[in-house]
Amino acid sequence: MKKKKRLIYLCIELVVFAAFISWHYIQLKIEEPLRAPLGQLVEADGHHMSVYSEGAGDKTLVFLSGSETTSPILDFKSLYSLLSDEYKIVVVERFGYGFSDVVDKPRDIASVLSDTRAALAAADISGPYVLCPHSLSGLETFYCAQLYPEEVEAIVGLDMAVP
């Protein structure tokens, strides 16, 4: 009798588990359009990097996210949506964030800057830029301004880290 009850409970558990798995796959199919990249995926150092742009102003604002910003495009949306009528807005998602690839390579300031510049070039976005760094990307911005002053028109810090 006990074995029969255990078998019944096990069958019920398996049916419930299968129902949850089926529901999960159905929801994934329904949500598939929501997982499409919001910007364009460009190649930088052999990997895909996400670059989002909108607006058509004369000046280009490039938003750079800090550490641990999982989706920079969505994170900055409340700000850039107010500015896109007057400026060209660009949001670069670093490797490992948003829709960009996760890579296994050094993430020092020089390589992050190199990847950002490569992504901007691949997306056909030319300077000079108004860089809008948040948090840790402030270090990358100062490094960029030192190495490539002709590419930086201005820096507008968004609670950025400074050396």
Model-inferred region functions:
Residues D75, L79, V112-T116, S137:
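Stable alpha-helical elements in mature extracytoplasmic
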Residues S126-P163:
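Conserved hydrolase catalytic core segment
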Residues R94-C132:
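Active-site loop/oxyanion-hole signature of alpha/beta-hydrolase fold enzymes
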Residues H47-F99:
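Conserved HGGG/HGGXW glycine-rich cap/lid loop of the alpha/beta-hydrolase fold
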Residues K2-L61, D85-Y87:
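Alpha/beta-hydrolase fold catalytic core
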Residues S78-L82, P106-D108, Y148-P149:
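Glycine-rich, phosphate-binding/catalytic loops in enzymes
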